[in-house]
Each structure stands twice: as structure tokens, then as C-alpha cells.
């Protein structure tokens, strides 16, 4: 297992390049244009931090369920696999912001449904208030919306699986801290910069950079001896 600093550095670089042009990054940017920034930032960051901790915990537990040798080999395979996947995405990417447009369309559709529902009668509104989810009594609906979009957007994502693999091979605490710092930087930039910043990001460059980083991690993992 690597040092805390090594886990922190790898996680910081990997998470930053994975998230800077990711779907959740664009979602945070667009949500921040429509709702109070502090609620959007709090909801998005909370979801990403929870996901990072869950992923690192799974990675930490993996060597206790199967041998460290196998977790090391699986992690190496994941790094190479994600590296080739990202490079492929980068080479076929036209350089535009197709994902930004896709996320915006999804959020517009969701907003339209919300507006249609708000036109119901007062009786239906009262019934909805009575059936309001338990969490809305403690958290703002905007916070919960930002949280759910980011949490489920990250679930099963390439960055989540990579975090699990990294935590299985490196210091889990370092991986968590590096991931949280990177998530904070990316999400804050998205919320403050909004759509204007998101539209300036080259998905192609981000994908190629992330792919090369994964390949480097894969080579390093391949050359690193497995602890007994």
C-alpha cells in the first residue's frame, strides 16, 4: 500500500481530470444559474463527498474480501481499461460541448415537468404538502435536487470505479482527501463560472489528458511489486 501523500496526489489528479468536464460538472454549472449558488454548491459537494467516501471504503475493504494480489491486478486492469476508454472518447470527440447541451436539455425537461405540476389545484397542492418527503422537513428542495442529481450521476461512473480501485491499492485516507479537494475545486469552479465557463472546456483535451493519466497509473501499478 502506498503512502498517504501518494494516495492524495494520485486521487487529486485523477478526480480533477475525471470531473472537470464530467456530466455532474455541467449539471452544477447549469443549476447554479437557476437556483441560489450556496444551496447548489452545498448539495453537489455533499453528494460528491459522500460518494468519494463510499467508494474509498469499498476499495479499502476489497483486499479483506479477496487477496491483495488479485485486487492489485484488478486495479491495474481498471487503470489501463479506463485509460484506453478515455483516449477513445477523446479521439472521437469533436471538441464541442455535446454533453453540456445534453445535460441542459435534461434539466430543462425536468424544470418543465416541475412547472406543469405547479399548475395543479390548491387542493392537490395541499395534498402534496401532506405527502412531502421526510427529508424536505430538514433540507431545502434545491439542496436535495442538487444532491440527487450529482449522487446518482456519479453512481457507477468511471470516476467512482477508479476511486474504488485506487483506494484498494493506495492509502484510503489519502484517496479520500485528494478526491474531496479535487471535487471541491471542480464544483466550486462550475458553480461560480456557470455555463460560460463550462462551454469553454474542451471535452477532447480533458478526455485525452485523463486517458494518459490513467495509462501512467496503470504502468506504475504494473511495475509496483504486490505486498505479501
Curated annotation (Swiss-Prot):
Superkingdom in the source lineage: Eukaryota
GO (cellular component) term, any one: membrane
Keyword Transcription (UniProt): no
Bilayer-crossing regions: 12-32, 39-59, 71-91, 133-153, 173-193, 205-225
Cellular localisation: Membrane
Membrane topology type: Multi-pass membrane protein
Residues with the N-acetylglycine modification: 2
Keywords: Acetylation, Membrane, Transmembrane, Transmembrane helix
Repeat found in the keyword field: no
InterPro entries per UniProt: GDT1-like
Chief subcellular location: membrane
Single GO MF annotation: metal ion transmembrane transporter activity
Family to which this protein belongs: Belongs to the GDT1 family.
UniProt-recorded name of the protein: GDT1-like protein 5
Source taxonomy: Eukaryota, Viridiplantae, Streptophyta, Embryophyta, Tracheophyta
Amino acid at each position: 500500500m502506498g503512502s498517504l501523500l501518494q494516495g492524495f496526489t494520485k486521487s487529486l489528479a485523477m478526480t480533477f481530470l475525471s470531473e472537470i468536464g464530467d456530466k455532474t460538472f455541467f449539471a452544477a454549472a447549469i443549476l447554479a444559474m437557476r437556483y441560489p449558488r450556496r444551496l447548489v454548491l452545498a448539495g453537489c459537494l455533499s453528494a460528491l463527498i459522500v460518494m468519494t467516501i463510499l467508494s474509498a471504503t469499498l476499495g479499502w475493504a476489497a483486499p479483506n474480501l479477496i487477496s491483495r494480489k488479485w485486487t492489485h491486478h484488478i486495479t491495474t486492469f481498471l487503470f489501463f481499461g479506463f485509460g484506453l476508454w478515455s483516449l477513445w472518447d477523446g479521439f472521437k470527440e469533436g471538441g464541442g460541448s455535446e454533453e453540456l447541451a445534453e445535460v441542459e436539455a435534461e434539466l430543462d425537461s425536468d424544470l418543465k415537468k416541475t412547472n406543469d405540476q405547479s399548475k395543479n389545484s390548491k387542493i392537490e397542492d395541499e395534498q402534496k404538502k401532506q405527502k412531502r418527503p421526510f427529508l424536505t422537513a430538514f433540507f431545502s428542495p434545491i439542496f436535495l435536487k442538487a444532491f440527487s442529481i450529482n449522487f446518482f450521476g456519479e453512481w457507477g461512473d468511471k470516476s467512482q470505479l477508479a476511486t474504488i480501485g485506487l483506494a484498494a491499492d493506495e492509502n484510503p485516507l489519502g484517496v479520500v482527501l485528494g478526491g474531496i479537494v479535487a471535487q471541491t475545486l471542480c464544483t466550486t469552479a462550475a458553480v461560480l463560472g456557470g455555463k460560460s465557463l463550462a462551454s469553454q472546456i474542451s471535452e477532447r483535451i480533458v478526455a485525452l489528458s485523463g486517458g494518459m493519466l490513467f495509462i501512467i497509473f496503470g504502468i506504475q501499478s504494473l511495475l509496483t511489486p504486490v505486498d505479501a
